[in-house]
């Protein structure tokens, strides 16, 4: 093992993190890629050192509610497993421990361990790459952009996109909000009443107990085999909706309706109302948070509820319409302020019913659409990955890019939905 530090050795600075960063602080992004060629690790390390010039938080250490950008470095490890071939690596589950990069999250949170670690495992005819990164530093958008930049530096010597480090972005975005100012200056009883009037759900003991029990039993880590949805099938449903209603619907709405249709009998949803929760990226949506913002800018929004008995086309139209309403400018501005005030004051509320999401027969599901991430954009100069495993977060439904050559989408289910 060794530490990789920034090439130009920047001066030490303190970077303040936002309230959205802080709520993600305990989490770790854990991504694996499989390659059918052996990587040039010397080139990868050189490019990583150059990358860290533009990503100072990754080479720093946590200090209170911020990161000391002291260029202490990230952890790098290489290992040989030449007895393994690509065909020996299972794709239906996250790779076994021998291929995992070391990451001590408890020590990282205490400022005593790197915020990112990398492991290259060489096989007889390829390699497994594992990158672990503290969610405190980045959300999915920022992480995969960073990986794309690293690969581009190794391959061409040029960054694809310049990261936008602005520690005041979220704070400035909230400064103009009357709702936010009112909430943070009010007493707890007033704030709780306001949150409940806005449709927020209080997190109860039952939900916490169910979460803890399922985590203890490992049920939350169950991962289904991917359900492959061809692009032509998505296009066909979009066309049917257009012909029947005269309205266009997005790809996401179609995939959501197909997921519910697939789960309806498996989950016993006939005759029931389901609530679908989406994760939304606020980059380019919220004034002041740019497209290349380096940090956390994504969170769940209020759910869309509908009958599970509806035809796919009707579900897709309803989901699309409701999401557009939820993400309309005025509603989104208000919700952004509510959400940030809620997490800043550490109040036990969520925009959806956690008890319903973690019950033995859940009717609330969280959907995480990862299709906009360039997951397969990690060609370091010796060829791109042939497979990328889904993240091991417990989102019940995840839309994931299919491997190169497959024209469609992988849909994964986790926990009780698997």
Residue locations for each model-derived region?
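Acidic, serine/threonine-rich, charge-biased low-complexity segments
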Residues: 189-201
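A short acidic-Thr-Gly-centered motif at the start of a beta-strand
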Residues: 117-124, 197, 205, 209
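Acyltransferase donor/substrate-recognition loop-hinge adjacent to the catalytic core
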Residues: 203-220
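Non-catalytic N-terminal regions of enzymes
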Residues: 1-192, 218-228, 234-292, 350-418
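Helical lid/core segments from catalytic subdomains that handle acyl or acyl-like groups
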Residues: 224, 293-375
């Amino acid at each position: 093992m060794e530490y990789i530090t920034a090439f130009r050795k920047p001066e030490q600075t303190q970077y303040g993190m936002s309230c959205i960063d802080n709520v993600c602080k305990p989490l770790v992004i854990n991504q694996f890629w499989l390659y059918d060629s052996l990587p040039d690790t010397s080139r990868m390390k050189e490019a990583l050192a150059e990358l860290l010039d533009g990503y100072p938080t990754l080479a720093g250490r946590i200090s209170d509610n911020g990161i000391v950008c002291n260029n202490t470095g990230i952890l790098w490890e290489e290992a040989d497993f030449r007895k393994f071939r690509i065909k020996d690596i299972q794709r239906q589950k996250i790779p076994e421990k021998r291929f995992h990069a070391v990451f001590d999250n408890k020590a990282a949170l205490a400022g005593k361990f790197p915020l990112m670690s990398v492991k290259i495992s060489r096989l007889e005819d390829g390699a497994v790459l594992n990158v672990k990164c503290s969610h405190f530093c980045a959300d999915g958008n920022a992480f995969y952009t960073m990986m794309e930049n690293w690969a581009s530096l190794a391959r061409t010597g040029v960054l694809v996109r310049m990261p936008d480090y602005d520690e005041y972005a979220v704070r400035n975005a909230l400064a103009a909000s009357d709702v936010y100012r009112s909430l943070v200056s009010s007493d707890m009883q007033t704030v709780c009443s306001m949150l409940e009037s806005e449709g927020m759900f209080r997190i109860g003991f039952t939900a916490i107990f169910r979460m803890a029990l399922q985590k203890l039993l490992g049920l939350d880590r169950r991962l289904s085999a991917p359900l492959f949805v061809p692009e032509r099938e998505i296009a066909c449903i979009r066309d049917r909706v257009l012909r029947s209603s005269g309205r266009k619907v997005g790809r996401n709405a179609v995939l959501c309706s197909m997921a519910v249709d697939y789960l309806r009998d498996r989950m016993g949803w006939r005759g029931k109302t389901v609530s679908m929760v989406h994760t939304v990226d606020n980059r380019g949506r919220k004034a002041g948070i740019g497209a290349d913002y380096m940090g956390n800018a994504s969170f769940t929004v209020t759910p869309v509820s509908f009958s599970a008995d509806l035809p796919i086309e009707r579900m897709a139209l309803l989901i699309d319409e409701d999401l557009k309403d939820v993400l309309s400018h005025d509603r989104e501005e208000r919700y952004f302020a509510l959400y940030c005030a809620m997490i800043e004051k550490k109040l036990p509320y969520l925009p959806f019913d956690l008890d319903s999401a973690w019950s033995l027969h859940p009717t609330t599901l969280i959907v995480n659409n990862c299709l906009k991430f360039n997951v397969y954009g990690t060609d370091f100069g010796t060829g791109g990955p042939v497979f990328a495993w889904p993240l091991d977060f417990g989102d019940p439904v995840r839309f994931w890019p299919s491997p190169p050559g497959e024209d469609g989408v992988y849909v994964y289910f986790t926990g009780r939905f698997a």
